[in-house]
């Protein structure tokens, strides 16, 4: 055996731990024939001369081990044990297969003869059955069954599908690594050395390991289906060359390092072991571990072979050409060889080593060139946004998922993290299955203190656990508003809700929905509970609701959109329309509990005090009934008295301003004129806040809104006319259904679509006026936009029947047939088949006499180029604006008599009617036609007005069409996600304002039947009509004309509130009203919540919340025309509102209801 440092017995270049002296001294001690000193010297001298030759034959020994005194090498015995075991077993398996094959061939012919004989014997039987098998066959069957049972048992023992199997597999792998570690320790010893089994601790451990390997090998052999292939497996070969040498080592009392390095091949199974332990779950991690384990095991195994041959030498050279290399030097040599660097400091000297290196370079280089780059790529591409969220103590977090893009995230963060929200202590965790691009990543980095991103899917419970969804304050799901298939997008978001609710049913979810009819599917989720904060923001419902309200009060869509969006105040010194518009844009909607100083006061009184004293505009309160169910009452009137713990809804520019309503104290603040000085005083009633009354916040979160304070406000109604009296009920025809079952909307029996279709000539003969024209682009394949959401607010029951504006749809009849199922229960709806681009169709519906023209498109999402998504709407808008008309409105107005409120004389300037929409004397050009156009792409707003100077990069809310209320984009609804999270009643308030009275109960009914159900007029349903509505108050004439010319807005606010219970909240002003020279421009813009001292002009229109008028049950307008006189009368009068006169309520004629019914019957056919 070659020793270290060039000797024959050393291994690894170091001296043996089991030698008492150096090899030369051991050789001298074994020479028993030399006893004299001279002979000893001669012998020593002789041995020194021949040391290189004799050293190769010497085996290092110790005095305690009775080893071969001649130093004979026994490596061949260890190798022979492995070879005999391998080839012997292989020979036995092949011999068994050969004998089995011959037996099968020999018995095949005999089997055919016996089978034919059995068939013949069986056919000769009378009953036709075969004879039973003989006893020998039964014995064979029993033996086969016993063998199969043993085989199945062995298979179960080693299968990873059972706990025992997994334990065995893991244990075998662990012991294999242990045996490899022992090899690493022994590699510092000589390749072959004498050892005593009873005194060598490492040999005993190695022996125990290999006994276990032998037992496991037996189990694998029994369980193997194909013994031959099992015998040739890598793991079997490893056992052949590592297990038998250990037993030989015990027998010979010597050790040979040999092929024990093959245990490194067990590392290939490392990924399987980690999968058994449920550590590796992703494909990338499994692939990475596979590549690493194959690379490392091949590397260590090859290093072990080089270590063996280089320290031993070539056999045909009598082991004289060996060199002392440690195992780790061989590992280094193999690495520089695989990488083709080859420094030359370490190299192979033996022929076997060099021959192995030749073949290893070919395979190793290929493996290095393919495996290493792939490993680096997998490590580099590991989920940068993996890991788990670590919750911060005392800080809430929300999870945002769904449609995560640069646009959606930037819009969300802009509103959620707005500086006006001074109480935001919420961390935002985004979860998406696609890693962010560079722009989105940069956005996250800019908000790194409050934003974190994790890559994953909410459909995966493991990812939900990573973001701590169970401890999250809420989960927000964003929708792709520009997707080609809205129903598919809604289905995806519904699945996300199902997955999240299945993981944690109590989590609060706020999701965006595109289609109104898909909201019904959310009600099927058992844990979905809107009372606990779950909300679905339907973009189609709100978008069309906003547009519908603009049909009643032009510009309202812009005002409402700005109210729930967080906008910073932009100060402009120049006296331009932008100055006043931006001052109103900075106002938002806030909530705050009212001070106890307001207890016992009526709503108008508190509203006036807040506006005059606190500089706050309160528009609604939260009312909780006796059964603790909350309702939001918008401008409820003077019959309601404020109680302790009432929650108010305010329009203000800052959250700090709203706190004045909570801090106000009559004793301390009554004489204060500067509202900024109203702060928390030292009164005991403010210091001793009730625990149930939540801390004042501008955006009260879930529990504060849904859970009632200590006491609830009670409705104290003193007006008997709020609910119809017995005389009214007697005059009602209980068999006529005029309203739906909830009493919130006007209703009629379902009509066939053919009955409402007008030809162009019929439409021209019907002199329509004061109506709403809806230009709709769509075809048979377009996605439905839900026109019901546009019609419902225009059919709210707080309008009298004669006040309803007739709705005329102009568009493809194929598309409208698909929408008609949801529209056939609404009265005063007509359809003109055609196209909005046809001027003939537009003239047929008298578009120049309409109160509003709405332009919608259902084909917006089928175009890849976003700039072309709005091409149809833009073309239609420009087409209408370029039309010219005759001065025909004067003829119509000469035959019409506007509606005069009871007790008012139209001839008196002070008693002029309050108009809903102020009409121009005549419309001769399409530019003056009121139009609202829906846009998908915000940047396309620049094409609507050719005379504006808006920059293409200007934000939508700063553009002139949006400020004037002539354009609306669904993107403005993104702010509702943040607003709803901070205050879930904000969404309820917005929906109450824009949908005309849609409630969760009504949604459940529509989900059940997909249509409104008619109901009889009962006191309960008629009471639902008593709710305020939005209108526009004209200052050109009427009871407020004196304030229109230079008066203060605050005086108008107080007068309207005291006299008519009307709540003013904005101005719709001509764009050039601030100019000293008259202008022909008829464009108007929105001013939200102007200050008290704001100066009015006569042409202003005032946005107001008007009370329901019980005295306006009959239309007094009549408009004669050729064939549809009653229909046209209703159209013209639909644009006229009245102020309720409390002095004349008691003098209402009892026959009013009967006249109402007659008129209803006349127009029912429409």
UniProtKB/Swiss-Prot annotation:
Intramembrane region ranges (chain numbering): 324-346
Positions with a binding annotation for Ca(2+): 942, 945, 948, 950
Subcellular location: Cell membrane
Record's catalysed reaction(s): K(+)(in) = K(+)(out)
Highest rank taxon of the organism: Eukaryota
Bias kind Gly residues: ranges: 1-15
Effect of residue 1151 to A: Induces a stimulation by PKA instead of PKG
InterPro entries in UniProt: Ion_trans_dom (IPR005821), K_chnl_BK_asu (IPR003929), K_chnl_Slo-like (IPR047871), NAD(P)-bd_dom_sf (IPR036291), RCK_N (IPR003148), Slowpoke-like_C (IPR048735)
Residues recorded with modification Phosphothreonine: 139, 693, 900
Modification after translation: Incremental phosphorylation of Thr-139 of the KCNMA1 tetramer changes the response to ethanol from increased activation to inhibition of channel activity. Palmitoylation by ZDHHC22 and ZDHHC23 within the intracellular linker between the S0 and S1 transmembrane domains regulates localization to the plasma membrane. Depalmitoylated by LYPLA1 and LYPLAL1, leading to retard exit from the trans-Golgi network.
Motif (Selectivity for potassium): 340-343
UniProt binding sites for Mg(2+): 427, 450, 452
Ranges spanned by the short sequence motif Calcium bowl, renumbered to the chain: 933-955
Biased composition (Low complexity): 33-48, 1116-1141
One CC-aspect GO term: apical plasma membrane
Region (Segment S7): 544-564
Domain RCK N-terminal as annotated: residue spans: 395-537, 769-913
Chain positions found as Phosphoserine: 695, 708, 712, 908, 912, 1151, 1154
Membrane topology (Extracellular): 1-74, 188-202, 249-252, 310-323, 347-355
Function: Potassium channel activated by both membrane depolarization or increase in cytosolic Ca(2+) that mediates export of K(+). It is also activated by concentration of cytosolic Mg(2+). Its activation dampens the excitatory events that elevate the cytosolic Ca(2+) concentration and/or depolarize the cell membrane. It therefore contributes to repolarization of the membrane potential.
Record protein name field: Calcium-activated potassium channel subunit alpha-1
Protein source organism: Bos taurus (Bovine)
Gene this protein is translated from: KCNMA1
